[in-house]
Amino acid sequence: MKELKIIVINNYGQFCHLIHRTVRDLDMDTKIVANTTSVEDILDEEPDGIILSGGPSMERVGSCQEYVESIDIPILGICLGHQLIAQTFGGHTGAGKLGGYAAIDVEVIEEDDILKGLGPRTSVWASHADEVTVLPDEFIHLARSDVCEIEAMRHEERPIYGVQWHPEVAHTDKGEELFMNFFKVCEDY
């Protein structure tokens, strides 16, 4: 695979730098940018893909909704990024049944581009303080768990994906595979 330019949007989550390091260690050109960066400045970077990091609250997502609505390249939302994507397209989020971080067994419902090779079950590290509770109309449900019905999703037409879990942490099995699957989507787009 050729080297791609992946922009990591900093939503002030504790694992943002781990996302950046993982992407870099997988031989991609990567840069962390503030979530207040203009769409124009992001496009000036000529990225092949965008990753929306996790973060503490929806009130601190800056311009992320504008990125999702107006930038036509592959986007992967992680945790809060996943929730933001859902809200942007009319889905709902709410408090999860299991707050805090824990190892979760995820069932892959549909092994699409982003979850290729991860199913039928995979162990992940996730926080469920908040989660997607209602899937947006234009999205396909990809994965679930006993503590969260919507662990992963993707847009029906656009290359927009969301996962509730953290593929960048060592506690997640096959996290690098998920990133490589996303890079393949970026390369093919």
Swiss-Prot record:
Domain Glutamine amidotransferase type-1, chain residue ranges per copy: 5-189
EC number per UniProt: 6.3.5.2
Any Pfam family: GATase
GO molecular function (one): GMP synthase activity
Catalytic activity: XMP + L-glutamine + ATP + H2O = GMP + L-glutamate + AMP + diphosphate + 2 H(+)
GO-annotated cellular components: cytosol
Alphabetical list of CDD domains matching this protein: GATase1_GMP_Synthase
Secretion signal span: none
Annotated keywords: ATP-binding, Glutamine amidotransferase, GMP biosynthesis, Ligase, Nucleotide-binding, Purine biosynthesis
Source species, domain of life: Archaea
Catalytic site positions: 79 (nucleophile), 166, 168
Pathway terms, separated by semicolons: Purine metabolism; GMP biosynthesis; GMP from XMP (L-Gln route): step 1/1
Quaternary structure (record): Heterodimer composed of a glutamine amidotransferase subunit (A) and a GMP-binding subunit (B).
Entry-linked PANTHER family: GMP SYNTHASE [GLUTAMINE-HYDROLYZING] (PTHR11922:SF2), GMP SYNTHASE-RELATED (PTHR11922)
Function according to Swiss-Prot or TrEMBL: Catalyzes the synthesis of GMP from XMP.
Name of the featured protein: GMP synthase [glutamine-hydrolyzing] subunit A
Protein species of origin: Methanococcoides burtonii (strain DSM 6242 / NBRC 107633 / OCM 468 / ACE-M)
Gene encoding the protein: guaAA
